Amino acid sequence: MKQYLELMQKVLDEGTQKNDRTGTGTLSIFGHQMRFNLQDGFPLVTTKRCHLRSIIHELLWFLQGDTNIAYLHENNVTIWDEWADENGDLGPVYGKQWRAWPTPDGRHIDQITTVLNQLKNDPDSRRIIVSAWNVGELDKMALAPCHAFFQFYVADGKLSCQLYQRSCDVFLGLPFNIASYALLVHMMAQQCDLEVGDFVWTGGDTHLYSNHMDQTHLQLSREPRPLPKLIIKRKPESIFDYRFEDFEIEGYDPHPGVKAPVAI
């Protein structure tokens, strides 16, 4: 994950001081891209320990179309707590948009099922896209989508994916985002009998919060270790039937975890 450390250093070297919605302050750059060949290993940051349980359960939660944190709490995942209301609801965030995007005539579009059908039946399409950025429902969401738009691409029997992330918390959020979408590519590829290709991450406002600087320098002082390998133990009937127990990360030997405050 040398690319991740290079991005951190780039933000430190070239970033502009900006104010932000949370009032914390950031160093920010605009427009950055990283490419991860998923054949080379699973792109899980090794210069600090990442909480894999949270990454997997959050993705499974998205895929169920869920927008209440009850499932996450049942599985000891607290990453959405700060934004939930007193009933645990977040409004029409990722899961709702992925699985039940509302249309003007009262229907709902299941974007995940749609792209799966496209990958199986029309893999050369340039429209294999999922969007979470529903401008008609942004004001109802506890947090507007940061990872907003992703596209799949099939070539030579391999499935690749590019994500556009409009806002990126490089220290806390980005390691989760990279691993989550890499996991999704593996799952979609398995369901479509494809090999994995590249995960391409594209960032808009790409920033380090002012209260993450010490933690950033600590990570930059550490040498990246070899990437682990993802093992999916079974092939479920559908993309929606995976369970936490289906995934194993082999050979993950990270440096110790590094804590940092969340900007809300």
Swiss-Prot record:
GO terms under cellular component: cytosol
Active-site residues, Swiss-Prot/TrEMBL: C146 (nucleophile)
Reaction(s) this enzyme catalyzes, per UniProt: dUMP + (6R)-5,10-methylene-5,6,7,8-tetrahydrofolate = 7,8-dihydrofolate + dTMP
Record keyword Transcription present: no
Location relative to the cell: Cytoplasm
Pfam families named in the record: Thymidylat_synt (PF00303)
Enzyme Commission no: 2.1.1.45
Chain residues that bind (6R)-5,10-methylene-5,6,7,8-tetrahydrofolate: H51, D169, A263
Keywords for the protein's UniProt record, in alphabetical order: Cytoplasm, Methyltransferase, Nucleotide biosynthesis, Transferase
Residues that, per the record, bind dUMP: R21, R126, R127, R166, S167, C168, D169, N177, H207, L208, Y209
Domain of life: Bacteria
Broad class of where this protein is predominantly found: cytoplasm
Example of a GO biological process term: dTMP biosynthetic process
Keyword Disulfide bond: no
One example GO MF annotation: thymidylate synthase activity
Residues passing through the membrane, by range: none
Family: Belongs to the thymidylate synthase family. Bacterial-type ThyA subfamily.
Assembly mode: Homodimer.
Function noted in UniProt: Catalyzes the reductive methylation of 2'-deoxyuridine-5'-monophosphate (dUMP) to 2'-deoxythymidine-5'-monophosphate (dTMP) while utilizing 5,10-methylenetetrahydrofolate (mTHF) as the methyl donor and reductant in the reaction, yielding dihydrofolate (DHF) as a by-product. This enzymatic reaction provides an intracellular de novo source of dTMP, an essential precursor for DNA biosynthesis.
NCBIfam families cross-referenced by the UniProt entry: PRK01827.1-3, PRK01827.1-5, thym_sym
Stated name of the protein: Thymidylate synthase
Species of the source: Shigella flexneri
